[in-house]
Amino acid sequence: MRLSREIVDHVAMLARLGLTEEERELMREQLSSILEHVSRIQELDTEAIPPTAQVITLQNVWREDDVRPSLPVEAVLANAPESEDGFFRVHAVLEQS
């Protein structure tokens, strides 16, 4: 499956990536290759294989909750397309009822 330039441009826009023409073509080739691989995997007969949600038997391995310095809010929001009152502003995904 060869991706169109429009799809690559759309994915780049969603990821907020500014791509050069060379990067766009490389991304097109790589994403097309990944989708072809996934397509081959989907063709496999897995009926006799039980679903596996967890392959490692470890559970609840926690680390200490240490407070560490973080970036100032202003520095983080400087990279956001939109912000408001110290928060990221995003477009609504769900309609209000």
From Swiss-Prot:
Residue ranges that the Swiss-Prot or TrEMBL entry lists as coiled coil: none
Entry's Gene Ontology molecular function annotations: asparaginyl-tRNA synthase (glutamine-hydrolyzing) activity; ATP binding; glutaminyl-tRNA synthase (glutamine-hydrolyzing) activity
The organism's superkingdom is given as: Bacteria
**Keyword field:** ATP-binding, Ligase, Nucleotide-binding, Protein biosynthesis
Q: Which GO terms describe its biological process?
A: glutaminyl-tRNAGln biosynthesis via transamidation; regulation of translational fidelity; translation
Query: What Enzyme Commission number(s) apply to this enzyme?
Result: 6.3.5.-
What catalytic activity is recorded?
L-glutamyl-tRNA(Gln) + L-glutamine + ATP + H2O = L-glutaminyl-tRNA(Gln) + L-glutamate + ADP + phosphate + H(+); L-aspartyl-tRNA(Asn) + L-glutamine + ATP + H2O = L-asparaginyl-tRNA(Asn) + L-glutamate + ADP + phosphate + 2 H(+)
InterPro entries noted in UniProt: Asp/Glu-ADT_sf_sub_c (IPR036113), GatC (IPR003837)
Q: Which family does it belong to?
A: Belongs to the GatC family.
Described purpose of this protein according to its UniProt entry: Allows the formation of correctly charged Asn-tRNA(Asn) or Gln-tRNA(Gln) through the transamidation of misacylated Asp-tRNA(Asn) or Glu-tRNA(Gln) in organisms which lack either or both of asparaginyl-tRNA or glutaminyl-tRNA synthetases. The reaction takes place in the presence of glutamine and ATP through an activated phospho-Asp-tRNA(Asn) or phospho-Glu-tRNA(Gln).
Return the PANTHER family for the record: GLUTAMYL-TRNA(GLN) AMIDOTRANSFERASE SUBUNIT C, MITOCHONDRIAL
Subunit notes for this chain?
Answer: Heterotrimer of A, B and C subunits.
**In its UniProt entry, what is this protein called?**
Aspartyl/glutamyl-tRNA(Asn/Gln) amidotransferase subunit C
Q: Which organism is it from?
A: Thermomicrobium roseum (strain ATCC 27502 / DSM 5159 / P-2)
Give the source lineage, highest ranks first: Bacteria, Pseudomonadati, Thermomicrobiota, Thermomicrobia, Thermomicrobiales
This protein's gene is called gatC
